[in-house]
Amino acid sequence: MKKYKTGLVLLVIALALLVYFSPWFFLHIASWQKEFNQLISENLHQIQNNSIKAGTTLIFASFVYGVLHALGPGHGKFIIASYLSTHESQLKQSTILSLLSSLMQGIVAITATTLLVVVLNLSSRYFKLSQLWLERTALLLLVFLGCYWIWQGLRAYRKKAKLAIKSLNPLPLHEKSAVKNNRTFQPNTCSCGHQHLPSPTQTAQATNLKSQFLVILTIGMRPCSGAIFVLFLAYMLDLYSWGILAVLAMSFGTGLMLSAFAGIVRYARNTAIHLGHWYSSKNTKGKSESIVKLIAGGIMLFFALSLLYGTTISTGGSKILF
């Protein structure tokens, strides 16, 4: 108990310091991103002269750029934090989720640039339009994810607590049957020995897999602008393969930082659960989890609709489609 209280106090102090220094921190993050963006551009130009040295520096600079990109503000951390706050997960599972989400961003950027620029050779105007629709698709997925969590929260909140048997005390048997019974029964199976319906654990696992898939798609469908810039520049310099490697390194750096962030969120959730265990019952725990999921889904839905509306507002110039 004392360990969790100490961890909670340290976490609150860290969050307070982060909020206090966030303007300075994000300003410097943006400045460092510009510097590494310039470094990436310089090394792409130098690869033709010294491919090994410039290429190694390019990959390293792209990796650091991905780390800085993850440290700055973004929708990925918000989605990951919302998911891990409302769903029980293991550390390995949350790490894989963060890495796959970041890798999905890189794959979408590479696929979109390859298809529209390299294969179809479309103009930058059409490419910007495709970026806009990718962003809208990601926001529509975010709307769906928010509605899905709200529905899950409402269903869990209305669900009545089931009666559970805490212990069974068998009576002593004075006589033992001479017939040996070799039949064993597994939970969630009928007398024929087959499982006809999924167990509660399997159902919960399938539901979590759906949510995880939606999280990966929602984050991945909105590629990083830095990755798009690197791919465009690499294509113009006829170094597209180096651009792909740089984007993959960028995605890996982003994924590592998101994994660290996911570990912090998971620790905070477990700490809150352990502290609440002393003054809450199983029924109130289920109700509080459903309320948290409702709030997270509502906030996600609000921001998704606001950002989606923002994509329909013209900021100057004409658009091919709304």
Curated annotation (Swiss-Prot):
- List GO BP terms, alphabetically: cobalt ion transport; response to cobalt ion; response to nickel cation
One GO location term (cellular component)? plasma membrane
Q: Which InterPro entries match?
A: Ni/Co_transpt_high_affinity (IPR011541), NiCoT_RcnA (IPR051224)
Q: Which residues cross the membrane?
A: 7-27, 54-74, 100-120, 137-157, 228-248, 294-314
Where in the cell does this protein reside? Cell membrane
Q: Which UniProt keywords apply?
A: Cell membrane, Cobalt, Cobalt transport, Ion transport, Membrane, Nickel, Nickel transport, Transmembrane, Transmembrane helix, Transport
Topology relative to the membrane:
Multi-pass membrane protein
Q: Which GO terms describe its molecular function?
A: nickel cation transmembrane transporter activity
What's its job? Answer: Efflux system for nickel and cobalt.
The family classification in the record reads: Belongs to the NiCoT transporter (TC 2.A.52) family.
**Protein name, entry field:** Putative nickel/cobalt efflux system HI_1248
Which species is this UniProt entry from? Haemophilus influenzae (strain ATCC 51907 / DSM 11121 / KW20 / Rd)
